[in-house]
UniProtKB/Swiss-Prot annotation:
It comes from Bos taurus (Bovine). Residues 46-83 are annotated as: Disordered. The modification Phosphoserine is found at S72. One of its GO terms (cellular component) is trans-Golgi network membrane. This is Arfaptin-2. InterPro entries: AH/BAR_dom_sf, AH_dom, Arfaptin_fam. SUPFAM superfamilies: BAR/IMD domain-like (SSF103657). GO terms for molecular function: phospholipid binding; protein domain specific binding.
Length: 341
């Protein structure tokens, strides 16, 4: 009866083909790749031996894998170096073993959730905030893309106006009868170029600040969110495992397993609750920082664009001074994003 209950508790709900093999699921490829990556970093077996006869094989089934070329005529007692190598190999094996068990439990929990056969822990308020953050990030990325496009168009316009101003100035010297007309058109284009460079500096500052907010501040919070979601999956996986063991018989063998499962579950629960608190704090700080940054940047963008199209050069320059924006001279190296803040 004990074997039947334990076998039922360890059963994973995966479709089986007619030949008795487990059905391939979309998650199988990713799991196989993860296994390959872990095994690559496994213990170094260059100075160990491989048993070719399977479990319980005789000593004749040992295949030496060392680099020695001369046959050994007598057994050599193991030295301190061999003990250290075995200890390292054992530690690596334990790491791979724990990773494999954890991956199996998490994959089982994930599949159960996908197919509606298992329960998951849900913090509705926190998950709503996380989804809102992801949606906000997508919208800000769109604003960032449009801001970069505007910067490219303004730069192209400045190049055209500069070339047009030079052409007018050259023609004013070579056409005495139209010298005055070409002259004031050349001055107008030069003034537009100057104001355009000021506007371009303001827009560049706006784009740089949005880029920092999206790719650094929001991304940092989302990295913590990913860690929280992984911890939630592990927590639910070990919670389910503990519940299955609790429903089984209470003999001497299962009692030890139950205590071990309880300790492991508590460790994952503490990790989950800690990361949940970290996410809540980061979301709060992110919202405050976003409002502060965007209030400043939207005011800058509005004042600069309004002054430029109104032809108010003085107000345009005052806007840059108000936000401590310094225009870079032609050919100067671009400052880092920290210097631009």
């Amino acid at each position: 009866m004990t074997d039947g209950i334990l076998g039922k508790a360890a059963t994973m709900e995966i479709p089986i083909h007619g030949n008795g093999e487990a059905g391939q699921l979309p998650e199988d490829d990713g799991l196989e790749q993860d296994l390959q990556q872990v095994m690559v970093s496994g213990p170094n077996l260059n100075e160990t031996s491989i048993v070719s006869g399977g479990y319980g094989g005789s000593g004749d089934g040992l295949i030496p894998t060392g680099s020695g070329r001369h046959p050994s005529h007598s057994a050599t007692p193991a030295g301190p170096g061999d003990e250290v190598a075995r200890g390292i190999a054992g530690e690596k094996f334990d790491i791979v073993k724990k990773w494999g068990i954890n991956t199996y439990k998490c994959t089982k929990q994930l599949l159960s959730e996908r197919f509606g056969r298992g329960s998951r822990t849900v913090d509705l308020e926190l998950e709503l905030q996380i989804e809102l953050l992801r949606e906000t990030k997508r919208k800000y990325e769109s604003v960032l893309q449009l801001g970069r496009a505007l910067t490219a168009h303004l730069y192209s316009l400045l190049q055209t106006q500069h070339a047009l101003g030079d052409a007018f100035a050259d023609l004013s010297q070579k056409s005495p009868e139209l010298q005055e007309e070409f002259g004031y058109n050349a001055e107008t284009q030069k003034l537009l170029c100057k104001n355009g460079e000021t506007l371009l500096g303001a827009v560049n500052f706006f784009v740089s600040s949005i880029n920092t907010l999206v790719t650094k501040t929001m991304e940092d919070t989302l990295m913590t969110v990913k860690q929280y979601e992984a911890a939630r999956l592990e927590y639910d996986a070990y919670r389910t495992d503990l519940e299955e063991l609790s429903l089984g018989p209470r003999d001497a063998g299962t009692r030890g397993r139950l205590e071990s499962a309880q300790a492991t579950f508590q460790a994952h629960r503490d990790k989950y609750e800690k990361l949940r608190g970290d996410v809540a704090i980061k979301l709060k700080f992110l919202e405050e920082n976003k409002i502060k940054v965007m209030h400043k940047q939207l005011l800058l963008f509005h004042n600069a664009v309004s002054a430029y199209f109104a032809g108010n050069q003085k107000q345009l320059e005052q806007t840059l001074q108000q936000f401590n924006i310094k225009l870079r001279p032609p050919g100067a190296e671009k400052p880092s994003w920290l210097e631009e803040q």
